[in-house]
């Protein structure tokens, strides 16, 4: 496991074991979550989201199931904003 919150593109690709073109194709198809904007010219993927997708693949989930999971993961990002307000 890692203590990182984000993976940059290369690390995210390595952790999914996908080629670069496949990685971005999966994002376009909704099979991987889109990146989070980290700065003006930097993006990253939440480690927890990449791990969740990998677990779903290991469990043999269908592409339809994974698309639903991606939607849930992206929607749950708004909780970070809500948690920040409560601190």
Segments from the language model and where they lie:
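Surface-exposed, Lys/Arg-rich phosphate-binding patches that contact polyanionic backbones
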Residues: 15, 35-36
